[in-house]
């Protein structure tokens, strides 16, 4: 995950050096009958005006780094690392970066008939085969899939993309049917918390208490906690923990470092706490995860 973010920051630095407007660059990394996957890097920022777009296919985009504001006919959401942007074919949408520059996503695109068949096979009624919400927070049920997609950006040939695309679609459809649309929040509070989330993403190895984050955002701890959970779908503690675990999962899958070193470098104070948290999040131990993600 750190390498994925670092590549985004380099792209943003190059855009600034060249004095060019932001742009979205998709790189298709896998495709099959009825589905495709792309590594999408966006270098837009507050200086770029958002514009209306349209989903030509059913879309599930996993945010891997950065963040943005997303609005569609299904609702709106602040997209942060680990969250899912959802779109049904034919929906109009708009992305904006009022609170910071750039994002990087792994986008899964599905042909409408293919996606509808997957949703039906998952047991979704006809009304639930189109997304009624704009986004999904970084939920534990999605963590293994989010981490596998991150690994795939670095090792494209090693990931069973079709299996991942099918599993992601089915799980997202089932989870999305139980998610409520987000209520509107005061813009000043939303902006402050959005900046705090970017701060967290850049300082995952630091001590990030609720009080400290609230002070830096200029909000009381209560209002910060309430606004953060409404925007991100999880508490600050859960967000930091899951971000650290995704980073650790990526390091375990792509490198050969010892588990204890991965734990410490990912911001955990001791390996026993790391092992418990990792197993709770991914359903297996760090070593078992490393073995299971060595697909070849």
Regions found by a protein language model. Name each.
Residues 153-157, 203, 207, 255, ...:
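Short coil/turn helix-boundary motifs
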Residues 63, 200-203, 252:
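Short helix-to-turn junction characteristic of helix-turn-helix DNA-binding domains
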Residues 171, 175, 195-202, 206-246, ...:
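Basic/polar phosphate-binding segments, predominantly the helix-turn-helix DNA-binding elements
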Residues 22-127:
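N-terminal regulatory/effector-sensing and dimerization cores
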Residues 45, 177-184, 230-232:
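Short, Lys/Arg-enriched N-terminal segment that forms or immediately precedes the first helix
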Residues 4-8, 121-182, 198:
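Amphipathic alpha-helical segments enriched in hydrophobic/aromatic residues interleaved with Lys/Arg
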